[in-house]
A protein has these predicted regions:
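Tryptophan-centered motif/residue detector
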Residues: 54, 102, 113-115, 144
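Tryptophan-rich aromatic "cage" segments
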Residues: 131-148
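C-terminal catalytic lobe of FAD-dependent flavoproteins
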Residues: 98
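Substrate-gating cap/lid region and adjacent catalytic-acid/histidine neighborhood
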Residues: 1-89, 101, 108
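Mature extracytoplasmic/periplasmic domains
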Residues: 108-136
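Conserved loop-to-helix N-cap of the C-terminal "lid" that shapes the substrate pocket in Rossmann-like
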Residues: 92-95
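Small/flexible residues
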Residues: 10, 122-123, 142
Length: 148
């Protein structure tokens, strides 16, 4: 089975453009980040993984690279951020949650979700309704096995 066929199975309603974006995102960001987490765990390092899923109201951006930065630093009101996150009510609850996790971690506290391990592969997903997911990316990881 080819990588593209695997993605078509995982995302049956995706257009060709959406499939290309998913493949590119995973190649550039997601798979390397997961491989780094796997390597850290294999070396005995405490590791937590998060994924920022809140989608910009700018339809072309979705949950694009670096969109989480104004949330992590609680800077949704900063000049120019609205161009990045889109117009409308500020998603302050998401920023409060993410900023709280980051500042607690900086101060030496552990995140509230379980550490990443090679069995459960726990990931915290930040969104309007944040959640903790186990093995959510396993089909993608399996598709990339031996490739990246």
């Amino acid at each position: 089975e080819s990588l593209i066929e695997a993605y078509r199975e995982m995302l049956p309603d995706a257009t060709e453009t959406e499939l290309a974006i998913e493949l590119g995102t995973d190649f550039t960001f997601k798979i390397p980040a997961i491989r780094l987490a796997e390597d850290r765990v294999a070396r005995g390092a405490d590791t937590w993984v998060y994924q920022f899923d809140w989608e910009s109201r700018n339809a072309h951006l979705k949950a694009t690279h670096a969109l989480e930065i104004p949330f992590a630093f609680n800077m949704l009101m900063a000049t120019g951020v609205d161009a990045f996150i889109g117009k409308g009510e500020l998603p302050q609850a998401v920023a409060d949650e993410m900023h709280g996790v980051w500042t607690s971690f900086i101060q030496g506290d552990e995140p509230s979700w379980p550490k990443y391990d090679l069995e459960k592969r726990t990931v915290q997903h930040f969104d309007n309704n944040s959640s903790v997911v186990e093995n959510g990316e396993l089909p993608r990881l399996n598709a990339w096995e031996g490739i990246r």
